[in-house]
Amino acid sequence: HHSGFTDDRHYLWAATLDTSKIFIFDVHTNPNKPKLHKVITNFVKASGGIVGPHTTYALPGRMMISGLSNNQDFGGRTALVEYTNDGTYVATYHMPHDENLYGATKTGQIADGYGYDVRALPRRNVMITSSFTGWNNYMMNLGKLMGDSEAMKRFGNTVVVWDLHSRKPKKVFDVPGAPLEIRCAWGSQNNYCFTTTALTSQIWLIYEKDGEWNTESVATIGDPAKIPLPVDISITADDKHLWVNTWNDGMTRVFDISDPHNAKEVYTHKIGDQVNMLSQSWDGKRVYFTSSLLANWDKADGPEKMPQFFKAYHYKDGKLEQQFAIDFLKEKLGLPHQMRFGAYSLYAKSPKDGAKVAELSK
């Protein structure tokens, strides 16, 4: 499902939501020919029952993995799981919930113990997690899920701010409607992050003020009544704009976040029948999109006649211009979900002769 580089960019960790296996690829020895280095098959046992590893996030010498579920009831209560770069289990850090807050302060009405994404701001000694749903829900057919009123109650509604050094949760915030991807500002003085809620179509700001962390809804995405279903987001390198993809209507949107407390939509563009992840170049001139959300949730077909794709665009004068597209079903490539790009220039190492390395994108 998702993948992430280790801090030295030598290995790419790819996690699976159903089997809970984690595949570690050597992408350093020969970038032209990534090689399977190791498979972690005992994630559930080692972690104490965590199921559905999602985000594989690099910390110094470590990989922090966010779980989505557990092997007791396969619901949404879960944890963060830490490994060394070579794949050795370190520790499990449970998400705070009403029965055990693990020392955290509940700032609102909810402490559900759910998880999804994880990001960190080391300069502020902060780690942030969001919340989605458990194995029972994400493995269910989407139509069946939407028609099950009880299942629809089992989505996360919280964001948690952690102490990065101690790995202990500090504050639990009410962010209703399944907050998904977390993206943090790039500027060294910009101590804030964004997330979007899949079920309520809101952009939320997670920010520090006077040494305390807070959350605030700062914009509405499309028409929430039509369930556009915001998924991936990406902040431009100058911290002035936020890209937001909405899976259900296949749109991408750009919001002006020059004032992060007052986000304003400035551009929309139809990408396809559905759209999920995006990645943009550091200079902001290229944006890439993929289509698949989850195999059991994806649309079978639509007017665009290309339900599963990778599409590349130039972004110039505030508008997208498509350059090419790859039909993943036609090419029998499977379901395209996430992209990861790397650049030798960032790590001061020249590529080997003949190696073709993609430009760094975020």
Language-model region placement:
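Short loop/turn segments that connect beta-strands within beta-propeller blades
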Residues: 27-30, 84-88, 164-167, 208-211, ...
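Residue-level signature of beta-propeller blades and closely related beta-rich strand-turn architectures
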Residues: 18, 28, 69-71, 132-134, ...
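Short, conserved, GDST-rich strand-edge loop motifs in beta-rich repeat architectures
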Residues: 6-10, 66-78, 130-154, 290-310
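Surface-exposed loop and turn segments in beta-propeller and other repeat-based domains
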Residues: 37-49, 90-113, 169-180, 214-228, ...
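Asp-box/WD-like beta-propeller blade repeats and closely related beta-sheet repeat scaffolds
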Residues: 20, 27-121
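Loop/turn-rich, solvent-exposed surfaces of beta-rich toroidal or solenoidal domains
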Residues: 193, 201-203, 224-304, 308-310
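Structural signature of eukaryotic scaffold interfaces centered on beta-propeller domains
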Residues: 1-8, 52-59, 112-125, 182-189, ...
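Beta-propeller domains
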Residues: 108-253
